[in-house]
């Protein structure tokens, strides 16, 4: 029985979601607002539609600026609205 509990504790916590998006605001301390684009097919007309969602992401070292393309990953709730963290800055704004 102890082998099962130790094996269960060392297993992965499941697949965490990762998203790419552009930073639209960096005015908060250690927080950036990232706009994530999702392409969905319309159920009736079958046209591909671009849907955007704004999420708040934790940026511990405050490296991301407005216009940067960033990779964000899902994490535990850090505040009332923050459930994502910045993994890396993929492309700097020009």
Swiss-Prot record:
Q: How does it assemble?
A: Part of the 30S ribosomal subunit.
* Gene Ontology CC annotation, any one: cytosolic small ribosomal subunit
- The name on file for this protein is Small ribosomal subunit protein uS17
Give one GO molecular function term: structural constituent of ribosome
Q: Which family does it belong to?
A: Belongs to the universal ribosomal protein uS17 family.
Cystines in this chain: none
Q: What does this protein do?
A: One of the primary rRNA binding proteins, it binds specifically to the 5'-end of 16S ribosomal RNA.
Q: What are the boundaries of the region Disordered?
A: 1-22
Q: Does the keyword Ribonucleoprotein apply?
A: yes
Give the UniProt keywords, A-Z: Ribonucleoprotein, Ribosomal protein, RNA-binding, rRNA-binding
